[in-house]
Amino acid sequence: MENQPKLNSSKEVIAFLAERFPHCFSAEGEARPLKIGIFQDLVDRVAGEMSLSKTQLRSALRLYTSSWRYLYGVKPGATRVDLDGNPCGELDEQHVEHARKQLEEAKARVQAQRAEQQAKKREAAAAAGEKEDAPRRERKPRPTTPRRKEGAERKPRAQKPVEKAPKTVKAPREEQHTPVSDISALTVGQALKVKAGQNAMDATVLEITKDGVRVQLNSGMSLIVRAEHLVF
């Protein structure tokens, strides 16, 4: 008997589950909420198939249920399904709210990463001198003055007005920030700033978690930020 091919990544496992249970899993588009306890059903149904282990199934389920398209599908009125697509009860309000918060946090993280990447690109471009200097204006040839005839009186040269040196404009002093060294010293409601490249955005502490600090920006967006991106 030939050996079955082995699935090496969670994405490959999800593709296999979408083909094996098309009424439950989907490889693209909006996903349907899964039955609570579906992991054990998977272990019972696909044990040994494609050399899948429980660890692989658990990792694939975690990736599937944290994807944006799955979180979009967790909404009021949606129904959970089992492996065969049979309904297994409507979603409760607590699960819907949890999915909504996860989706907002994921979007905020992506937006912060994009802002940081754009700031780094601008810094790199400035350092490399990618901006081209304006082209120099061509000099016009100086007009030739007629030579003075012998015996003619020399006209006195007009004195040039003394030009005043232009006043130097002092560059605005760059705002200094103090990094946050200990997040346990922070308090809920405390004002601080979130660094994004060379910029620092005003924010307020909402919660201190094991992964970092949940803050709310002035725009109303909330996100979890690591300590190295926080300053006073």
Curated annotation (Swiss-Prot):
Q: Which domain of life is it from?
A: Bacteria
| Compartments, as annotated in UniProt | Cytoplasm
Which InterPro entries does the UniProt entry name for this protein? ProQ, ProQ/FinO, ProQ/FinO_sf, ProQ_C
Looking at the Swiss-Prot or TrEMBL record, what is one Pfam family this protein matches? Answer: ProQ
A biological process (GO) of this protein is: post-transcriptional regulation of gene expression
Q: Ranges of Basic residues compositional bias?
A: 137-146
For whether the record's keyword set contains Cytoplasm, the answer is: yes
Q: Where is this region: Disordered?
A: 105-182
Regions of compositional bias (Basic and acidic residues) in chain numbering: 117-136, 147-177
Keyword Metal-binding in the entry? The reply is no
Please give the GO cellular component terms listed in this UniProt entry: cytosol
Could you tell me one molecular function GO term of this UniProt entry? RNA strand-exchange activity
Classification via NCBIfam families: PRK04950.1
Reported function:
RNA chaperone with significant RNA binding, RNA strand exchange and RNA duplexing activities. May regulate ProP activity through an RNA-based, post-transcriptional mechanism.
Q: Which family does it belong to?
A: Belongs to the ProQ family.
* Protein's name according to its UniProt entry: RNA chaperone ProQ
Which source organism? Shigella flexneri serotype 5b (strain 8401)
Instruction: Identify the coding gene.
Output: proQ
